[in-house]
Amino acid sequence: MKHSKLTSVRVAIVFATFLALFSVITLHAQKIGEIKRTVLTKQDLSVPGREGLLVMVEFAPGAREARHTHPGDLLAYLQEGTLSLSVEGTPTRTVNPGEAYFVPAEKVHWAECAEKTPCKLLVTFVVEKDKPLMSPAK
């Protein structure tokens, strides 16, 4: 009997450890994907080969973007939440509601929403036409 109780305890410990690790991995994976982008308008510009987009970006609490670039300039205005913004080559900064920021074309950057509240941004892109709006960083 002692042997089967010991085996049961070991199985329970292994199972609990697996479950805990799986939960952490799942939560981490979900944080990256909890970002909604809605294109509000897309318009050819007076500059040949360029287009402008106005995009609403919504982060779930704690969500973060993967490192990426855009084929043109980005201007953003944070309406709600607190965002941690990292632009390669510059110190990470905190963006608060009512603040705006700029990211130059092809500059690697990423952002993370604070854990407690969602983040909502209004983003204007001035980008090269017919290129993907976002590309993973190399």
For each predicted feature, which ranges?
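Bacterial N-terminal signal peptides that target proteins for export
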Residues: 2-15
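Bacterial N-terminal signal peptides
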Residues: 12-24
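A short glycine-rich, His/Asp/Glu-containing loop-to-beta-strand
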Residues: 32-67, 124
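Short acidic-glycine-tyrosine-enriched beta hairpin
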Residues: 59-60, 89-106
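Histidine-centered metal-chelating micro-motifs
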Residues: 64-66, 84, 101, 105-112
